[in-house]
Amino acid sequence: LGVYDVRYNSSVDLQEHVDVGLSRSVDGGKTWEKMRLPLAFGETGGLPAAQNGVGDPSILVDTKTNTTWVVAAWTHGMGNQRAWWSSYPGMDMNHTAQLVLSKSTDDGKTWSEPINITDQVKDPSWYFLLQGPGRGITMQDGTLVFPIQFIDSTRVPNAGIMYSKDRGETWKIHNYART
């Protein structure tokens, strides 16, 4: 399985018409099935697809349950500026990027509706929270872990991890890396 941005209009990053694409191979990468969209918002909340971009995905396979998770940043109604500069403190989807998940229990063939976990993991003082870089892992005790990054209240970039100890039902941010 491989996840990536599907950028329809140009190479421009969020905010733009961007969906999360997934390619699936069952023969070690010799051939690939038709692209799937585990996260795509299209026209949502009265706004066009270009105002509902979702991208920069990270993937995690829960090796204990064989559930695949994809996490990405969704930018709803933030104009045409880049998400790094048009996402603001708070939690409202019209003003701050949302962190969303989708899960598959059939090896990436089908995907759940988006699961918005912003309220679980974002500090309201932060400007922007998103996943990555990199992919997630399953710890030996079953804890699911994704890398994250965020812009704090002073506009300083930070990195860390978010984790779930209950198979993805709830998520928390761990102490983040500081220099």
Predicted stretch roles:
Residues 1-179:
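Asp-box/BNR beta-propeller blade signature and adjacent active/binding-site loops
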